[in-house]
Amino acid sequence: ALPGGFCEIEEDLIDTARRELKEETGLTDIPIELINTWGEVNRDPRDRIITAAYLAIINDMPAPVAGDDACDADWFNIEIRQRGRAKIQKDGKDIINSLYNLKLINRHGDEECTAMVSVKENAKGIIKERKIEVIDNNNIAFDHARFIIDAMLYIDNSIDQ
């Protein structure tokens, strides 16, 4: 699972993200940015959960620190390969449907997690209405693969601008 947890009643979302990052990885004083909010009714098998996903980018990887409710922590290299891309018509709209293979390999190379993720978005217009869905998953928390794909697409789009 990615670092994260629940917001305290008197806590802002960004403060929750910073607290959880510190508690579960030991990282502090790094810039973070909200990239998406996930709130489908049945997205989390535990309960009705709304997730605010934040992105952090760091230059150096300090030793991972597991704390709080995290039993262990590690750094993973991310490999993303676009497996396919097609333009389709749906409800009179041009939709771009992309399929991605995601692979996470820990820094020791002895743990690997994979997923296949579908990304559908409007081909035209400013509002893309991006829908990201996990098609296949191996050892990544239930829908966290789509958070990773979304973050990588966010970075790609930011670099392109």
Predicted regions and their residues:
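Unchanged
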Residues: G5-D160
